[in-house]
Amino acid sequence: MKKYLAITSKGLENLLADELVALGVTDPKLVYAGVTFEAPIEVVYRCCLWSRIASRFIQILSEFDVRDDMDLYLGASAINWPNYFTADKTLVVDFNGTNREIRNSQYGALKVKDAIVDRFTKADLERPNIDKAEPDLRVHMRLSGEKGILGFDLIGSGLHQRGYRTEAGRAPLRETLAAALVLRSTWDESKPLLDPMCGSGTLLIEAALMACEMAPGVKREKWCFEALSDFDPEVWTEIRSEARVKSRRGVKKVDTHFYGFDRDYRVIQTARDNARRAGVEDLITFDVGDATKIERPEGFENGVVICNPPYGERLSTEPALIALYSEFGRQLKEQFGGCTASIYSSNDDLLACIRMRADKQFKLNNGALPCVQKNYSISESAERKEAANIEVAPEFMNRLKKNLSKLGKWARKEKLDCYRLYDADLPDYNAAIDVYKDYIIIQEYTAPKEISEDKARRRLTDMIRATVLVTGVETNNVILKVRQKQSGKNQYQKLAEKSRYFDVEEYGVKLIVNLQDYLDTGLFLDHKLTRKMIGDMAAGKDFLNLFAYTGSATVHAACGGAKSTMTIDMSRTYLEWAQKNMNTNDQTGTQHQFLQADCLQWLQQAEGEFDLIFIDPPTFSNSKRMDQTFDVQRDHIMLLENLKRMLRQDGTVVFSNNKRNFKMDEEALDKAGLQAKNISKQTLPLDFARNKHIHNCWIITHKED
């Protein structure tokens, strides 16, 4: 008997061996990502047609040492290729692997191709042609170190191509992988199966094919073994006909129920189309549904919930996924007691959010991505109701409810779309939570070193889940950021090209925010009362805004009736943002000027006079674009002395900064001919009342005679 290699994904070797034994193979031997065996041709045909897990079957012609390209050529030349196929058949060589001497797979494929063609030429036969697109035959060469395996790929395009899926949903699973997940999920034909995040339906379709005993290759039209000289059409026709009859009968006998849900109606339609092409459309009910709100179907006793939920590469950038897994886990416990669940993901942190202990788990890559499949037993009804009624982080949740009741009412009254809901009120939940219209930003402060990663992750997931439950925000509208002390060049670091800009309202003024591109959003929430005050003071005045950021104070001044405005910042990005803010409020014209400049240098040589000046400098700056460093405690008098020169006699400077324990040098200020009034308390909005040191704010005027 001839020797064969069945190829599969790493981690599925045992499962494949069991499948091959069921198909008639005796004495299979496990190898890396595959199984070798010897079998008669009818068993091989049956394996090709019926295997749900193998991606390819290789007829092994030779195994030989390959130290260099000469060994490769001689090893391939030793095979009498004309005995296996005729010259009218087209072929391609698939070369997998490299070693120290053969470092390029294309070069290796070329040497094997040369050896094959030369054997035909030496036998005075025509050369077979190469066809990379649609070859009759695929020659398979696998190189591992100095060991080579050479043979025919009996399949052609991989066995995962069942013929029913012409388009897929998000991040589709290969059919062979999906079949393996089903086989390891605790499901069998006697149990109903539900996929709450079904995408294009692959898991359910593969399970339905198993239930009705439909061969996965029954709809396949082309097989490379048909081009080999020893192909036995009678045996193959009999095996395929038997499979077709079995499939037709099987569909009629199945009484197992399959359910698929997805939030995207377009993907659901794709799943229905795929099921129709697979011939199992009558067995599966597909519908639009949210996995976090999914209800147990009637008659779903002892059923299995299986899914491949989305998973991000980095937990810190995917708060919506934390909320999704957390809420999905809660829904499983509440709705599916007595059932089992099988979940496949690459992210253990996300799987931990489900809050169930796995009975079994299997490591299994999705392509090159390491993943794990975990099987869970869901407790019966009494226990699950108790689990469902337990509040997530009750102390944190209660504080959030209290804050939302108080601050939400205040924000609506003040016509504020944005406010701080929570600001590290509880030491165990060290984060700031901001509301931006229909979005929530959770800004997690870096955990102390003595807090373990597991505990920090648990608290973070609790915060996200509790925030979603209390506020009712859509999980996709939750944004997570890790906040650290920012200085100089990384204060306005760009995060990603997601460009989520939208308008928010603040005391009747529209301002543009961006929640994801930068560490900050374009709007400092603690200054909302300061900006309102500037708007109230600005009527008929010439206004100057220094270190202007996105110009929100300028917008308030302009909307408050300022005669003119000058907005200065060193960043072109933020100046353009400021202009857009002004345009959004119909504040246009030459009376509104924008200047890109280093504010410190500009002040030293600037001319002109202003009635109202707002300056909110950084606490410290060492930007490469500034010639000197700046420290607000050290340099504030110098700053104010320069401003005095530009301030009209009855004018006002609103001076603010965020340095904790800032001390105004009133003696030096007096010598400079200026006087100061601390208005920090008056400019502290209700949502920042718990953080009295978030900023300090001063009214600076010329000293009265």
UniProtKB/Swiss-Prot annotation:
SMART domains reported in the protein's UniProt record: THUMP (SM00981)
Top EC category: transferase
PROSITE patterns for the chain: THUMP (PS51165), UPF0020 (PS01261)
GO cellular component: cytoplasm
Superkingdom per UniProt: Bacteria
Molecular function via GO: 23S rRNA (guanine(2445)-N(2))-methyltransferase activity; RNA binding; rRNA (guanine-N7-)-methyltransferase activity
The reaction(s) this protein catalyses: guanosine(2445) in 23S rRNA + S-adenosyl-L-methionine = N(2)-methylguanosine(2445) in 23S rRNA + S-adenosyl-L-homocysteine + H(+); guanosine(2069) in 23S rRNA + S-adenosyl-L-methionine = N(2)-methylguanosine(2069) in 23S rRNA + S-adenosyl-L-homocysteine + H(+)
Start and end residues of each THUMP domain: 43-154
Pfam families, alphabetized: Methyltrans_SAM (PF10672), RlmL_1st (PF22020), THUMP (PF02926), UPF0020 (PF01170)
EC numbers on record: 2.1.1.173, 2.1.1.264
Transmembrane segments: none
UniProt-listed HAMAP family: 23SrRNA_methyltr_KL (MF_01858)
Family: Belongs to the methyltransferase superfamily. RlmKL family.
Chain's role: Specifically methylates the guanine in position 2445 (m2G2445) and the guanine in position 2069 (m7G2069) of 23S rRNA.
Protein name, per record: Ribosomal RNA large subunit methyltransferase K/L
Organism name: Aliivibrio salmonicida (strain LFI1238) (Vibrio salmonicida (strain LFI1238))
